[in-house]
Amino acid sequence: ASGEMINFTKLANDCQVPPSTVTEYVGLLEDTLVGFLLPAWTESRKRKAIRTAKFYFFDPGVTHMLAGTRTLDRNSHLYGKSFEQFIGMEIRAYLSYRRKKREFAYWRSTHGYEVDFLIGIETAIEVKASQKVSGRDLRGLKALKEENIFKNYILVSQDPINTRDDNFQALYWEKFLDDLWADKFCC
């Protein structure tokens, strides 16, 4: 599935092929722009970070087709993953079009704290498909803030109310994209 950590060895065992074959196939998907690997950010000093990359398809439609999804229920897990994928692809497009030479990564600790996207050391972004955000949605961002590295901590959601609290911003997804393309979060 798109946006999931990819374990080359497990995938190779499931397919009964050598791990090098899986690595080559994933490389082929990247070369043909069908998908890309999002590396894990491992510079965390306070919490041990997972080092496994995530794989994203270039388009949520590919993910839906492979999953056999004809309609997307707003309350489904796939809807949330698709929304995350959409925001991730917008960030990736922004970095490419603006020729920003910043690392694009994600962070996950061994204790399960996670932040969906990191742009260099400037911006940490958590994506939630919910229409009403809560303090619980900031868990990963708050854990990452303890590192004192990133300048912006942003929760992107479908909640139309934009808020700011103690260096954290909760932004409606359209506002986030407007601000992203206006260069407000990155170099």
Task: Describe each model-derived feature in a short phrase.
Residues 130, 135-149, 153:
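Short, charged, amphipathic alpha-helix that recurs within catalytic cores of restriction-modification
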Residues 59, 113-114, 136-139, 147, ...:
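Nucleic-acid endonuclease domains
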Residues 120-133:
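Active-site ExK catalytic segment of metal-dependent nucleases
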Residues 124, 154-155:
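Structural beta-sheet core signal
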Residues 160-187:
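Domain-level recognition of nuclease-like catalytic cores that cleave nucleotide substrates
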